[in-house]
């Protein structure tokens, strides 16, 4: 599985090593040409059968489990490759990314029901972004309300 990784994050010591190991595609979010290059590269790899992890918020922030604005451009990969989108809800991941300690952090990872091309193929990029975000937001609300037991993984 590949990762579309922001240049600023990728330049950090540990991240740089991980990027090399997983053959990540690095994207400079401040450079429009590089954004296009990276999205085209990811699209090509997805069409050839490789899976990619993309953070549509454009990076990690101290978000306190609140979704940030999704960057619609990253959904070009899915629209052009006509592949399913698997939304992933990450709960408490911000705690590990914005800390200067090596303390243990429990992060919940919820893989949601895949969204097939037949469900989003007629939508524009911005609409796909909102559709995916709404699915993740629904799961985040369930987690916050205690409706999802963190000790097991539930798909759907």
Predicted feature locations:
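Non-catalytic C-terminal accessory region of glycerolipid acyltransferases
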Residues: 36-156
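Catalytic core of membrane glycerolipid acyltransferases/transacylases, capturing the structured
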Residues: 1-32
């Amino acid at each position: 599985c590949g990762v579309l990784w922001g240049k600023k994050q990728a330049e950090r010591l540990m991240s740089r090593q991980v990027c090399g190991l997983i053959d990540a595609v690095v994207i400079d979010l401040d450079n429009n040409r590089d954004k296009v290059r990276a999205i085209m590269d990811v699209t090509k790899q997805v069409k050839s059968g490789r899976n990619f992890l993309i953070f549509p918020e454009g990076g990690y922030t101290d978000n306190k489990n609140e979704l940030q604005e999704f960057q619609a451009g990253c959904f070009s990969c899915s629209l052009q490759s006509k592949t399913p989108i698997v939304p992933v809800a990450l709960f408490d991941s911000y705690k590990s990314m914005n800390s200067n300690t090596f303390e243990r952090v429990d992060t919940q990872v919820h893989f949601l029901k895949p969204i097939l091309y037949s469900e989003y193929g007629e939508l524009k990029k911005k609409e796909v972004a909102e559709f995916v975000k709404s699915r993740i937001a629904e799961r985040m609300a369930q987690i916050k309300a205690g409706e999802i037991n963190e000790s097991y993984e539930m798909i759907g």
